[in-house]
C-alpha cells in the first residue's frame, strides 16, 4: 500500500479507499472480516454517505469497528451529504441546516465525534455558497469535521463554493476508469472535430491538479451510472480481453490491473473500490507493485474504443 496527502492537507491516507455503500448488505461477521482485511493490507480510508442503505452502512461500519476493537485513530472516515428523499422525492440540498443535520446523523450512526472528511455529494443547482460556508465553519470550529471536499463537481462549481468557503476543498469524487474516460478524452482530442473533443466537465482533471484537489475515482469497473460493469458489456469486449492479457503478463488480478491503469496517471488519484470480498481486496493491493509502461497504458485506453488523433 502507498500513502498520500489528500489535497495537500490530510496526511497518511491510503491511496486506495474502501467504499462502504454495500456494507449494509452483509452480516456483522462479514463486515468485521472486510474491515480487518482492509486494515491488514494497509487501507485506512473508508468512504460513506448518509444515504447509503438509508444510513445503515454507516451504522454497520461503527458496529464492526466496535466488535473488532479497532481504535478510531486507525481509520480515516469520509462521508457525504446533500441528497434528500432518495426513495420518494429525490432532490439535492446544500442548505446550512441540512448539511449540519446530515453530519449530526452520520456522527451518531458512526458512533464518532468527528468526520475526517465531509464531501458534498452531487451539485445542488440552488446552492448558496454563503450558506455552505457557514455550515462548514460551524462544523469545523466544533471539531466535528476536519476537512471538506466535493463530489461530481466541475471547476466553476468548485470556484463558486471556494469563493465563500474558507477551508480548502481537498477532494473531488468523479467517476473514472478504463471504460469511463471523459476526463481524458477532451484533452487528448484538443482542436479536433470529433465527439471525443467535446469538453463535458470544464477540464476538471487539469483544474484539480492545478489546485491540489485529490480526485477520488468512483466505480472504476463500471461504464457509467446506469450501464453496469464494463466486463459484462458487449461494447467493451476488446477492453476486457486486453486487461486480462496484461493482468496475466504482470501476474496480478484483473482488478489490480484496472487500478494500476488509474494509478499510472500522474494526478495521484485515490481510487475507491467497493468490493466486500476479502480475497479480492487483498488481490487489489498488487496494483501498487507494478507500473504500466506508456505503451501499455495507451493500448488499454485505445482498446476501450478511444482512437488517438
Residue ranges and their predicted role:
Residues 1-75, 141, 222-224:
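N-terminal binding-site loop/beta-alpha segment at the start of enzyme catalytic domains
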Residues 108-128:
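Active-site groove signature of glycoside hydrolases
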Residues 26-38, 94-109, 156-159:
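Short, acidic/polar
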Residues 23-29, 49-59, 124-128, 151, ...:
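Acidic-and-aromatic substrate-binding clefts and catalytic sites of carbohydrate-active enzymes
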Residues 19-29, 87-97, 126:
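Active-site mouth loops of central-metabolism enzymes
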Residues 68-96, 121-122:
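Structural motif corresponding to the early beta-alpha repeats
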Residues 129-309:
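Beta/alpha (TIM)-barrel catalytic core signal, keyed to glycine-rich beta->alpha loops juxtaposed to Asp/Glu
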